[in-house]
């Protein structure tokens, strides 16, 4: 249970760092950052592998890069939806 909570906290931090790199604000606050961190870790692992330091099952650098990619794509989608409305 404790490792799951640590993983969620790491996912939140990764999501916040990814959104800070891209400069987009995530919808959903902390929950949005957690989702971005988890999906970013998945994207980063798929694209870049597991190089670099690891914390709570997350390869830090690929996860941050993946979160930045995810937040950037999410920002493009939301911008497109706002323009259509």
UniProtKB/Swiss-Prot annotation:
Bilayer-spanning residue ranges: 2-22, 28-48, 58-78
Topology class, membrane: Multi-pass membrane protein
Signal sequence bounds: none
Main location: membrane
Pfam family for this entry, one: Transgly_assoc
Keywords assigned by UniProt, alphabetized: Cell membrane, Membrane, Transmembrane, Transmembrane helix
Superkingdom, natural source: Bacteria
GO cellular component: a single term: plasma membrane
Compartmental location: Cell membrane
Xref: PANTHER family: UPF0410 PROTEIN YMGE (PTHR33884:SF3)
Family: Belongs to the UPF0410 family.
Identification of the protein by name: UPF0410 protein YdaS
Gene name as annotated: ydaS
């Amino acid at each position: 249970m404790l490792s799951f909570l640590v993983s969620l906290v790491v996912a939140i931090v990764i999501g916040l760092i990814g959104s800070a790199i891209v400069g987009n604000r995530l919808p959903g606050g902390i929950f949005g950052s957690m989702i971005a961190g988890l999906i970013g870790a998945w994207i980063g692992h798929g694209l870049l592998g597991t190089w670099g330091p690891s914390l709570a099952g997350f390869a830090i650098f690929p996860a941050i890069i993946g979160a930045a990619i995810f937040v950037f794509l999410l920002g493009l989608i939301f911008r497109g939806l706002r323009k259509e409305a």
